[in-house]
Curated annotation (Swiss-Prot):
Database matches in InterPro entries: aa-tRNA-synth_II/BPL/LPL (IPR045864), Gly-tRNA-synth_heterodimer (IPR006194), Gly-tRNA_ligase_asu (IPR002310)
Record field: catalytic activity: tRNA(Gly) + glycine + ATP = glycyl-tRNA(Gly) + AMP + diphosphate
Summary of subunit composition and partner proteins: Tetramer of two alpha and two beta subunits.
PANTHER family: GLYCINE--TRNA LIGASE, CHLOROPLASTIC_MITOCHONDRIAL 2, GLYCYL-TRNA SYNTHETASE
GO MF, one example: ATP binding
Record-stated family: Belongs to the class-II aminoacyl-tRNA synthetase family.
Protein known as: Glycine--tRNA ligase alpha subunit
Pfam families hit by this protein: tRNA-synt_2e
Signal peptide: none
Enzyme Commission designation: 6.1.1.14
Organism, scientific name: Streptococcus pneumoniae serotype 19F (strain G54)
Single biological process term from Gene Ontology: glycyl-tRNA aminoacylation
Higher taxonomy: Bacteria, Bacillati, Bacillota, Bacilli, Lactobacillales
């Protein structure tokens, strides 16, 4: 490669590529979450019969992974580029390799391996067949074919491609520390993010009010339940995300025991499952608006029998 792509040029290249494959370009969802999978643009849209093709950048917060900005590769917050396609194209892996070529990575010149790594997210009742993608010995992407989301079987199957943008950029720019990544011409990643990394790490590990977080979890859980009683799927799911992030803060602080941890995860999972069922029922009531007319009529007729 002649000029190395900046972080934002990597994003722009991936956006253009997946736009050309028919994906809608969504924006990052405005609630804290631990992974792009937890965005409603993936979690909710992966279930039910309607087609869905979307791509978006998702900042992902993992309080327990914070290292005060001192670790070159471990972060409180990193960025994922998320692609979800339902139904899954038969050539999704070929499309992925083509996207790497657009980034200047020729698959014929590098050791690219798909390493089996089936995926599970216990807190949302989700699982699928998966592979890690390793580029010259470094994991850069997670591939998943969802089999279950929110405790519901997926049909049709959704394919998810999650690029780790920091790792990808480190490789492309040949730097050893994420903080040396060039975000834009003349601006390094560390100049933007190293201070927030330090502050969030200090807060997560030392400063956060455990009693407040415990109370907030209970309040968020209760409010999610109230929203669901009114059939309000999206506000309810916002509170599921708040429960998840609050739990992650408690976990980072060491405020929950091993047995309590399992209990909190089960509480989040139970809410997520009700949200998923309610969402599917809502889409059916609306007549599956994203389906083509013929498929919609056939499916609604089958449901009415």
């Amino acid at each position: 490669m002649s000029k190395k792509l900046t972080f934002q040029e990597i994003i722009l290249t991936l956006q253009q590529f997946w736009n050309d494959q028919g994906c809608m370009l969504m924006q990052a969802y405005d609630n804290e979450k631990g992974a792009g999978t937890m965005s409603p643009y993936t979690f909710l849209r992966a279930i039910g019969p309607e087609p869905w093709n979307a791509a978006y950048v998702e900042p992902s917060r993992r309080p327990a992974d914070g290292r005060y900005g001192e670790n070159p590769n471990r972060l409180y917050q990193h960025h994922q580029f998320q692609v979800v396609m339902k139904p899954s194209p038969s050539n999704i892996q070929e499309l992925y390799l083509e996207s790497l070529e657009k980034l200047g990575i020729n698959p014929l010149e590098h050791d690219i391996r798909f390493v089996e790594d089936n995926w599970e997210n216990p807190s949302t009742g989700s699982a699928g067949l998966g592979w890690e993608v390793w580029l010259d010995g470094m994991e850069i992407t997670q591939f998943t074919y969802f089999q279950q989301v929110g405790g519901l079987a997926t049909s049709p199957v959704t394919a998810e491609v999650t690029y780790g943008l920091e790792r990808l950029a480190s490789y492309i720019q040949e730097v050893d520390s994420v903080y040396d990544i060039e975000w834009a011409d003349g601006v390094k990643y560390g100049e933007i993010f190293i201070q927030p990394e330090y502050e969030h790490s200090k807060y997560s590990f030392e400063i956060s009010d455990q009693e407040m977080l415990l109370e907030n979890f209970d309040k968020f859980e209760k409010e999610a339940g109230r929203a669901l009683e009114e059939g309000l799927v999206h506000p309810a799911y916002d509170y599921v995300l708040k429960c998840s992030h609050t739990f992650n803060l408690l976990d980072a602080r060491g405020a929950v025991s091993v047995t309590e941890r399992a209990g909190y995860i089960a509480r989040i999972r139970n809410l997520a499952r009700v949200v998923a069922k309610t969402f599917v029922a809502e889409r059916k009531r609306l007549g599956y608006p994203l389906l083509d007319e013929e498929t919609r009529a056939k499916l609604l007729a089958e449901d009415a029998e």
